[in-house]
Design a protein with these regions (language model features):
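Surface-exposed acidic/polar loop and edge beta-strand patches at domain peripheries
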Residues: 1-192, 204, 215-252, 267-387
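Histidine-centered active-site/metal-ligand motif
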Residues: 212
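Mid-to-C-terminal polyanion-binding domains and interfaces
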Residues: 258
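Flexible, substrate/cofactor-facing loop regions flanked by secondary structure
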Residues: 264
Length: 387
């Protein structure tokens, strides 16, 4: 298929475009769903120098942060925002983040996006693994993209793909190259992520990745519901035990609510495809997160039902691993390896549900998958953490 391409950033050729506005007219395309891509350099506070790419197609607007590993800040569909309200209000430039701060929790100083990639040398909670001190959720999210490109199909329906390359390289440690592709098709309330991890080094390496996908109001509200086809669900730690019976229901915001995390072993179809759905109390707004269990075999549900100011949010997080520190997950078989010059693909999709019929259809698909297996609620965490 023939495509139009526009390179935005290319570190190898010292090329970078700023403050531009492209439209379908820029490519000589006439279409029923006009599109545009706008670039901004942000100013002030810790967002000084951060960059924002805003892609609009029809009634969908997606904001990307190339300075922060092409994170998706939020998505707006027909006036409904999908994302969440963090106490971190700025789009923080990684130059101002010390990931070693707060006992390895410095990553949280920039955490406010809808889609955050955690990895790739490690993901999960901070702590010592062997002789290494691992910070929260790895380093990729605080790495700017080295290459960014817009691609538009010449032929209808003129699918749009925003691609980026983010490198995770450290002498004697890793030589990872991550290609990130996000595609949208006109007329669909859906975006599709296809990422590729490549080990450019000469040695086999461990890797981990978690897609930390986060949703707040209006999709999240009291009386809302999670629908996740699962073989088993267990509490992450002792605190989460008290919420196990209601792991899939949404309570109102509550001051003093500490995060509750649940480990899920999902059910998939014969091709490995599965979906998790979150919808509001009226079941007329929601989101369906699709992924493949051959690539991302486990799911973490993160419930942070704190006050709206502090962060009223639920995470639907498919990954190669749970959120435990890497040292605990080898025994679970959840620290995969990638050989020299090998690659791994990860596919994640987001379908934005805008009415009762769309919500009901996605929930029915989940129920159909669950019908094949009896869900087990396991009382004990998979890992015994130090008190």
């Amino acid at each position: 298929m023939f495509t139009f391409e526009h390179i935005i950033t290319d570190s190898e050729n010292n090329h970078h475009e700023v403050d531009f506005h492209l439209t379908n007219d820029s490519f000589g395309i006439t279409c029923t769903a006009p599109f545009s891509l706008t670039h901004q350099v942000l100013s002030g506070g810790k967002q000084q120098g951060s960059e924002l790419l805003t892609l609009t197609q029809g009634d969908m607007t997606i904001r990307f942060v190339p300075t922060r590993a092409m994170a998706i800040l939020d998505v707006v569909v027909a006036g409904t925002r999908f994302g969440w309200d963090s106490s971190v209000k700025e789009v923080v430039n990684p130059a101002f983040i010390n990931q070693e701060a707060f006992g390895g929790l410095g990553w949280l100083e920039g955490f406010n996006e809808m889609v955050v990639r955690c990895g790739y040398q490690w993901a999960g909670h901070p702590g010592v693994d062997g002789e290494e001190m691992l910070t929260l959720h790895g380093r990729i999210q605080n790495t700017p993209a080295s290459f960014v490109k817009l691609t538009v199909d010449q032929s209808p329906p003129h699918n749009i793909t925003l691609s980026a390359r983010v490198d995770e390289k450290c002498f004697k440690r890793s030589d990872f190259e991550v290609w990130m592709h996000v595609s949208v098709a006109p007329g669909e309330n859906k975006l599709v992520i296809r990422d590729e991890l490549i080990n450019r080094g000469d040695y086999e390496r461990e890797y981990q990745v978690i897609y930390h996908n986060n949703f707040g109001t209006p999709v999240l509200d009291a009386g809302g519901q999670l629908h996740v086809p699962a073989k088993s669900v267990s509490p992450f730690n002792e605190y989460a035990k008290q919420g196990l019976a209601s792991w899939d229901s949404i309570d109102p915001p509550r001051k003093g609510f500490d995060e509750m995390v649940f480990n899920v072993f999902p059910i998939s179809d014969e091709q490995g495809n599965t979906t998790a759905v979150l919808h509001n109390a009226q079941a007329n707004k929601g989101v369906a997160v699709g992924y493949n269990t051959s690539q991302l075999p486990v799911l973490t549900i993160w419930k942070n039902l704190d006050t709206p100011k502090q962060g009223y949010v639920v995470g639907i997080e498919p990954g190669t691993s749970f959120a435990y520190n890497r040292r605990y997950q080898r025994a679970l078989g959840l620290v995969p390896t990638i050989g020299a010059n090998e690659s791994r693909e990860f596919d994640v999709s987001f379908t934005f549900l805008m009415n009762e019929q769309q919500v009901a259809s996605q929930v029915a698909d989940v129920i159909c998958l669950q019908h094949t297996t009896l869900l087990s609620l396991d009382d004990e965490p998979l890992v015994t953490l130090p008190s």
